[in-house]
């Protein structure tokens, strides 16, 4: 997969957004049964045997592994951060003011930003083939966790 992408394009920024963890978190004993999760209507389902075929299946990304693969292709890691940090630093609060219904706006922001929702569970990894020295990403940096 990565070979097909990174060997055939130049001058790019690769943005990976998904559920996931660093290696230490990914293989934590708490997740000894894996990271597979089932969702229906944006709600987690505990019993996957009920309503088979009527839910989404999600498996978390091992971002440390992605980082090691990126190194094989000599890619630069520009950023590794949480969805919360990414969205806050790309002006989600200002942009959300366009949503006039305060209740709706607050529910959307809560879902996207709160650590117990998507804010900490989704990670953002930004890779590129040539680091631009004048391009600075000011997100809270979690690269040390990889």
Label each PLM-derived region with a short phrase.
Residues 1-146:
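Long, Lys/Arg- and hydrophobic-enriched amphipathic alpha-helices
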């Amino acid at each position: 997969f990565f070979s097909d992408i990174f060997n055939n394009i130049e001058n790019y920024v690769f943005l990976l957004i998904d559920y996931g963890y660093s290696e230490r978190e990914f293989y934590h004993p708490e997740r000894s049964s894996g990271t597979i999760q089932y969702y229906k209507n944006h709600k987690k389902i505990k019993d996957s045997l009920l309503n088979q075929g009527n839910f989404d299946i999600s498996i978390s990304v091992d971002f440390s592994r992605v980082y090691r693969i990126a190194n094989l292709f000599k890619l630069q890691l520009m950023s590794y951060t949480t969805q919360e940090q990414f969205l806050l630093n790309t002006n989600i609060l200002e942009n959300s003011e366009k949503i006039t219904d305060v209740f709706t706006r607050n529910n959307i922001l809560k879902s996207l930003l709160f650590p117990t929702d998507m804010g900490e569970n989704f990670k953002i990894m930004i890779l590129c083939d040539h680091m631009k020295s004048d391009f600075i990403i000011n997100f809270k940096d979690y690269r040390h966790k990889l």
